[in-house]
């Protein structure tokens, strides 16, 4: 199946602690159906001191399931479903079903 959400896409969180917030996809993990989104699903990690790193509590992004994400419409920034269509020149592109705008290329 083709990827509806890709690295670099602007997405909106549909469910969970960060519902309604948006961010940029940093990484997609297709085998796990999860994605890493900048500024979303922040967790605190307690780091023990090592020779290379100081001890402390660090905040970082955790992965979020793809079913809890929707692509942001390029026109208005709201959540939209994604469709695929083939253009006249033969390229297969993603488009926002809400507005009909082409997302890539």
Swiss-Prot record:
Q: Which GO terms describe its cellular component?
A: ribonucleoprotein complex; ribosome
- The answer, when asked if Ribonucleoprotein is one of the entry's keywords, is yes
Signal sequence: where? Answer: none
Listed Gene3D superfamilies: 2.30.30.30
Q: Which UniProt keywords apply?
A: Ribonucleoprotein, Ribosomal protein, RNA-binding, rRNA-binding
One Pfam family of this chain: KOW
Gene Ontology terms describing biological process: translation
| GO MF annotation list | rRNA binding; structural constituent of ribosome
- Which CDD domains does the entry link to? KOW_RPL26
Q: In terms of domain of life, where is this protein from?
A: Bacteria
Q: Which InterPro entries match?
A: KOW, Rib_uL2_dom2, Ribosomal_uL24, Ribosomal_uL24_CS, Ribosomal_uL24_KOW, Translation_prot_SH3-like_sf
Question: So what family is this one in?
Answer: Belongs to the universal ribosomal protein uL24 family.
Q: What does this protein do?
A: One of two assembly initiator proteins, it binds directly to the 5'-end of the 23S rRNA, where it nucleates assembly of the 50S subunit.
Q: How does it assemble?
A: Part of the 50S ribosomal subunit.
This one is known as Large ribosomal subunit protein uL24
> Organism, per UniProt?
Beijerinckia indica subsp. indica (strain ATCC 9039 / DSM 1715 / NCIMB 8712)
């Amino acid at each position: 199946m083709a990827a509806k959400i890709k690295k670099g896409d602007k997405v909106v969180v549909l469910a969970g602690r960060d519902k309604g917030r948006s961010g940029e996809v940093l990484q997609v993990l297709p085998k796990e159906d999860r994605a890493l989104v900048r500024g979303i699903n922040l967790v605190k990690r307690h780091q023990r001191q090592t020779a290379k790193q100081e001890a402390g509590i660090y905040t970082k992004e955790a992965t979020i399931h793809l079913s809890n994400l929707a692509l942001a419409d390029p026109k208005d920034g709201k959540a939209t479903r994604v469709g695929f269509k083939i253009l006249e020149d033969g390229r297969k592109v993603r488009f926002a079903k809400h507005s009909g705008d082409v997302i890539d290329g």
